[in-house]
Amino acid sequence: MDVTAKYELIGLMAYPIRHSLSPEMQNKALEKAGLPFTYMAFEVDNDTFPAAIEGLKALKMRGTGVSMPNKQLACEYVDELTPAAKLVGAINTIVNDDGYLRGYNTDGTGHIRAIKESGFDIKGKTMVLLGAGGASTAIGAQGAIEGLKEIKLFNRRDEFFDKALAFAQRVNENTDCVVTVTDLADQQAFAEALASADILTNGTKVGMKPLENESLVNDISLLHPGLLVTECVYNPHMTKLLQQAQQAGCKTIDGYGMLLWQGAEQFTLWTGKDFPLEYVKQVMGFGA
């Protein structure tokens, strides 16, 4: 790819960032489509995020992806949020239109799309959702919008717990889905929730390097063959949770599905063009 002065810059702001496949995926897509953009990753945490956004405006960047730990903070630095992003309380995509910043969340639409592409109908179903960070709440919000009957959210009593309660209130007030929030330490409640669940989704970083030997499911017997188990983590590709699920006879969806579909939507938001889906799946080795 020959980058010229006519090219516009798209970024990714996260910390850590070195594990991300997004730059490779997006640049392959941009090159295939023949579009004058280049995508670069920047190590940005909560402390440096405000300055990074000022830099985005000053450099007239087309936009940026936003990942951990900046997804919730980023909402404070855009001029407009989509209705879904307001419901989530976090964004993973910023589009810069001549200094006017719009915030979107494609994590939720991407993950739910991956579930649908597998042939699973979420309408009327119950999801056990692990975590209350930006990705997890995005999945929950989009699932609620698209027809989930109930979401049982489990999170440790950490800095995200109150945010989880606020998220549940927003979803309960604005959709027909019922969301409850429970401390993950309550293993009896967790076991009971899994017994009646249709979907288990890990929206945390547990399972991602260097936590690749960990899973929030301590007892594999809690998983049953009728359960669909889905992951947000894609590094490693086969997390411990997915290994447990396959051993228990569950159908699984790996983190590549969410990465692919959320990235496809981002691509269109930034460029106005269709994402070369089949090409990217092939060159990236995604089975989604």
Swiss-Prot record:
The GO annotation for biological process reads:
amino acid biosynthetic process; aromatic amino acid family biosynthetic process; chorismate biosynthetic process; shikimate metabolic process
UniProt: NAD(+) binding residues:
132-135, 155-158, 205, 232-235, 255
Q: Recorded E.C. number(s)?
A: 1.1.1.282
Record-stated family = Belongs to the shikimate dehydrogenase family.
PANTHER family, per database record: BIFUNCTIONAL 3-DEHYDROQUINATE DEHYDRATASE_SHIKIMATE DEHYDROGENASE, CHLOROPLASTIC, SHIKIMATE DEHYDROGENASE
Q: Known Gene3D superfamilies for this protein?
A: Leucine Dehydrogenase, chain A, domain 1, NAD(P)-binding Rossmann-like Domain
InterPro entries linked to this entry:
Aminoacid_DH-like_N_sf (IPR046346), NAD(P)-bd_dom_sf (IPR036291), Quinate/Shikimate_DH (IPR022872), SDH_C (IPR041121), Shikimate_DH-bd_N (IPR013708), Shikimate_DH_fam (IPR022893)
* Keywords attached to this entry: Amino-acid biosynthesis, Aromatic amino acid biosynthesis, NAD, NADP, Oxidoreductase
What molecular functions are annotated in GO for this chain?
quinate 3-dehydrogenase (NAD+) activity; quinate 3-dehydrogenase (NADP+) activity; shikimate 3-dehydrogenase (NAD+) activity; shikimate 3-dehydrogenase (NADP+) activity
Catalysed reaction(s) here are: L-quinate + NAD(+) = 3-dehydroquinate + NADH + H(+); L-quinate + NADP(+) = 3-dehydroquinate + NADPH + H(+); shikimate + NADP(+) = 3-dehydroshikimate + NADPH + H(+); shikimate + NAD(+) = 3-dehydroshikimate + NADH + H(+)
Q: How does it assemble?
A: Homodimer.
Q: Which residues form the signal peptide?
A: none
The organism's place on the tree of life at top rank: Bacteria
Entry keyword Transmembrane helix: no
By what name is this protein known?
Quinate/shikimate dehydrogenase
Binding of substrate, residues: 71, 107
The record's listing under HAMAP family reads: Shikimate_DH_AroE, Shikimate_DH_YdiB
What job does this protein perform? The actual biological function of YdiB remains unclear, nor is it known whether 3-dehydroshikimate or quinate represents the natural substrate. Catalyzes the reversible NAD-dependent reduction of both 3-dehydroshikimate (DHSA) and 3-dehydroquinate to yield shikimate (SA) and quinate, respectively. It can use both NAD or NADP for catalysis, however it has higher catalytic efficiency with NAD.
Q: Which pathway is it part of?
A: Metabolic intermediate biosynthesis; chorismate biosynthesis; chorismate from D-erythrose 4-phosphate and phosphoenolpyruvate: step 4/7
